[in-house]
Regions:
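HotDog/MaoC-like acyl-thioester-processing domains
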Residues: 1-13, 96-152
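Hot-dog-fold acyl-thioester-processing enzymes
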Residues: 2-87, 152
């Protein structure tokens, strides 16, 4: 792998990447839910058993946090000249994520646009698909990233 940064000009529409391996633990599910999403199906085995989840499941927001960690690790490994993100256009939680699941991510660059007002940066739209260890699609998202242009 090159030590050179990946810039806006290096991104190609349609390019894909697969990365990450994040194993969700029961402790993480309970800790995250207790602090940020204390719904009973995230916290109680007994309650979760009476729902369509069937057992304790991770909060969708916890799933997003795990995905974010894998994305940042990938960006750091690829040495992308990233400048953050103005947000998501779409987010879907398709299947529950359970303690013990191992997640991975596949991304695709949808398109990129140079900034008209900030020549030092551009933006790109990407689609992410999140799979568990059984290759079941558990979440999808479309987001916008900001990235530095070469020479700026």
């Amino acid at each position: 792998m090159s030590d050179e940064l990946v810039y806006f000009e290096d991104l190609e529409d349609g390019s894909t990447a697969s990365f990450g391996r994040y194993e969700d633990t029961r402790e993480e599910v309970l800790e995250f839910a207790a602090k940020y999403d204390p719904q009973p199906f995230h916290l109680s085995d007994e309650f979760a058993a009476t729902t369509h989840f069937g057992r304790i499941s991770a909060s969708g927001w916890h799933t997003c946090a795990m995905v974010m960690r894998m994305m940042v690790d990938n960006l750091n490994e690829r040495k992308q000249a990233g400048l953050g993100s103005p947000g998501l256009d779409e987010l879907r939680w398709l299947k529950p994520v359970y303690p013990g699941d191992t997640l991975r991510v596949e991304t695709e660059v949808l398109d990129k646009t140079p900034s008209r007002s900030r020549p030092e940066m551009g933006s790109f739209r990407s689609a992410a698909r999140v799979y568990n260890q059984d290759d079941v699609l558990v979440a999808t998202m479309k987001s916008i990233g900001l990235i530095r242009t070469r020479g700026n």
